[in-house]
Amino acid sequence: MNVNLYCPNGEHDNNISFIMPSKTNAVIVYLFKLDIEHPPTYNVNAKTRLVSGYENSRPININLRSITPSLNGTRGAYVISCIRAPRLYRDLFAYNKYTAPLGFVVTRTHAELQVWHILSVRKTFEAKSTRSVTGMLAHTDNGPDKFYAKDLMIMSGNVSVHFINNLQKCRAHHKDIDIFKHLCPELQIDNSVVQLETRSS
């Protein structure tokens, strides 16, 4: 993935929404225009700024790209450590199996719905607590288990301060999941047993 995100305009094509749990029966929704026709070129010297979106001289212009986990950082940008899957795995949030609370974000375009199971969000480097995670293994009753590799998503450019703050604070309780059935009827919620895989496991 290597795309730019802007404030939406009057057109309804190429919008992308990010939906994250907030409080009981409440969610936060962010809507951006997705530029898929002009993949941005990454400039290592480009600065990452937090912007409100109200300044005329600094409009929201987020470069969102993925890097390999072996490169666990990028100067000044925000590193989102996550596991992307086409469905939401409830078990990850059900029993507080992990020392750090986890979150999730449902991303939706006209063509695809994807769930980012958020492990950590940190500036410049991936959080130390999640560096050993290699992915998530979902156990299934029918067929082979499914492994999803960890992704590092990098946000740089003029980044919405409210968006990144809410990503950093995103924490999910398993009871927060059911409201997404009403907001995203096409979302598949999977009750399979899952576990985070680490380099030492």
Swiss-Prot record:
InterPro entries: AcMNPV_Orf146. It comes from Autographa californica nuclear polyhedrosis virus (AcMNPV). It comes from the Viruses. It holds the Pfam family DUF884. This is Uncharacterized 22.9 kDa protein in IE0-IE1 intergenic region.
